[in-house]
């Protein structure tokens, strides 16, 4: 048994631990696995930005730094084009398959129009973010994003991003509409529509 003196115990008897629960290879001065995975502040501890195993891990950093918003070497317009194309393409499915006209012949066209409407609303929100007061906030580099794009966080950069987002969103929705309207999907579309059928 290993003895341990607890200063908060009222009795002077040391606490005894079973040997199988004590790791004798770790000494108090050693840097163990706990210290390697400890949460530490990035720069100023008063800001509240912490470096954790999740946000400073290799996979998280590689994933976030390869998103179009943070990837290096892209113009703000092309960033917006990529992000908008993904939004338009991914929003088309829910609007076409779960919309109010899902059981009619106009489901695909209604999904296209609903998606383009949603892209217009999101574009208006991006315009409003750039309009009032000061310029968009410039994100400082931290433990996750090493080099945030400085050209994106200016008024002209954000306007270019917004115009690219609108064009990419409408283009992504039209591309998804064209894919769903091909003859190859005629056998699959009734099955997909039947999943969300309302009786």
UniProtKB/Swiss-Prot annotation:
Cellular-component GO terms for this entry? photosystem I reaction center; plasma membrane-derived thylakoid membrane
What is the protein's membrane topology class?
A: Multi-pass membrane protein
Q: Which GO terms describe its biological process?
A: photosynthesis
Subcellular locations according to the entry = Cellular thylakoid membrane
Residue spans crossing the bilayer: 81-101, 108-128, 165-185
| Keyword terms | Membrane, Photosynthesis, Photosystem I, Thylakoid, Transmembrane, Transmembrane helix
Question: Do you know which InterPro entries this protein is assigned to?
Answer: PSI_PsaL (IPR003757), PSI_PsaL_sf (IPR036592), PSI_suXI (IPR022980)
Q: Which Pfam families match?
A: PsaL (PF02605)
The family assignment reads: Belongs to the PsaL family.
The record's section on NCBIfam families has: PRK00704.1-1, PRK00704.1-5
Its name, as the record gives it, is Photosystem I reaction center subunit XI
Which organism's genome codes for this protein?
Answer: Prochlorococcus marinus (strain SARG / CCMP1375 / SS120)
């Amino acid at each position: 048994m290993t003895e341990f003196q607890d200063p908060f115990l009222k009795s002077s008897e040391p606490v005894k631990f079973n040997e199988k629960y004590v790791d004798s290879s770790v000494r108090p001065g050693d840097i163990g696995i706990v210290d390697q995975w400890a949460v530490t502040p990035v720069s100023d501890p008063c800001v509240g930005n912490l470096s954790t195993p999740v946000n400073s891990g290799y996979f998280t950093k590689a994933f976030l730094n390869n998103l179009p918003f943070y990837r290096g070497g892209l113009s703000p317009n092309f960033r917006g084009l990529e992000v908008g194309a993904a939004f338009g393409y991914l929003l088309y499915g829910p609007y076409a398959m779960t919309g109010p006209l899902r059981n009619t012949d106009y489901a695909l066209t209604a999904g296209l129009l609903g998606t383009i409407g949603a892209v217009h609303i999101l574009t208006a929100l991006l315009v409003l973010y750039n309009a009032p007061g000061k310029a968009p906030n410039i994100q400082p580099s931290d433990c996750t994003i090493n080099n945030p794009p400085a050209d994106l966080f200016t008024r002209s950069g954000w306007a270019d991003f917004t115009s690219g987002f609108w064009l990419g969103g409408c283009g992504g929705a039209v591309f998804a509409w064209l894919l769903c309207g091909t003859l190859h999907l005629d056998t699959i579309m009734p099955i997909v529509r039947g999943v969300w059928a309302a009786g």
